[in-house]
Amino acid sequence: MDLVIIGLCGQSVFPSVDHFHRPEETLHAHDLFAEPGGKGYNQAVAAARMGANVAFAGAVGPDADGEACAKRLEEEGIVPLMAVKDGRTAFAAILTDRRGENRVTVYAGVQLSAQDIDALEAQIASAKLLLLTPEIPEPAFARAMELAARHGVRVVINPAPYVRWVEPYLADAWCLTPNRSEACAMLGCREEELEARLACAPHPRMLVTLGGEGALCVQEGTMVKIPARPVVPVDTTGAGDCLNGALCARLLAGDTLLEAAKKAVLAASLSVTRAHVLDAMPLEAEVMG
């Protein structure tokens, strides 16, 4: 596989509500949808739909949710590299309001270990790109970084959620893809200072996502603003995952970082015009056409 993604996977449920909870308020959902998910899992589907050859590695329990995760990957043409472990598969509840905004609660479930990553060495060694997020435990993350370095594999780190333990690994990534708040946490600045700090950021390549405003592509001190396509959002859940998967797919297709970033921003713009996550990921023909 050209792209290996290691991340969290589990079952996701999507209740749709008119507005988010006020204190002590009980809400009644007017719609309910369920599908497998997780940041890395979503990124894998996005990359595969953009034409990449993808393998996804995650941990699941010996339960129906774990089986559903593997089955959907196969349906999307993705190679599932699942570690089946004692315990429950991860679970997420994504509440979406009528504006398309969301609130997410995650139960992490069973977790990958460093030993699980060791079992993936052959797949990592043969990959051209490795995509990681710190939603997996640090020992597994560290071992994946070590194996990528050993075999000369480029690593893209999507530092979401941003946690302090990820900081020592950022310098070894080929590219970082934080959102605005994660970039501010990385650089120790306020949002209004972000662009000035990015101009002298220590990392040579960053793609900072700005939600509906698009993204900032930073290379060797040069910064380019990439506007998002103007759309009416239906559901913003998974837009960042879409962008990361599409970015990696286009890098593997031979695009420069800036070229890949422009197409990734377009893919993310298209994704928010549709409900839910996996079904919202655009196909390569939609983005390239």
Model-derived features: where do they sit?
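Short glycine/proline- and charge-enriched loop/turn segments
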Residues: H21-A29, T177-N179, V224-P227
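Gly/Ala-rich phosphate-binding loop of Rossmann-like dinucleotide-binding domains
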Residues: A48-R49, A149, L252
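Small-residue (primarily alanine) positions within well-ordered alpha-helices
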Residues: A44, A148, A183, A260, ...
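Glycine-rich phosphate/adenosyl-contacting loop at the front of the ribokinase-like
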Residues: M1-A59, A64-A68, P233
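Conserved phosphate-binding/catalytic region of the ribokinase-like
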Residues: L3-V4, R164, P168, E191-G289
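Ribokinase/PfkB-type carbohydrate-kinase core domain
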Residues: M1-C9, K71-V84, T96-M223, L283
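Hydrophobic residues at beta-strand termini and immediately following loops
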Residues: A57, T105, I226-P227
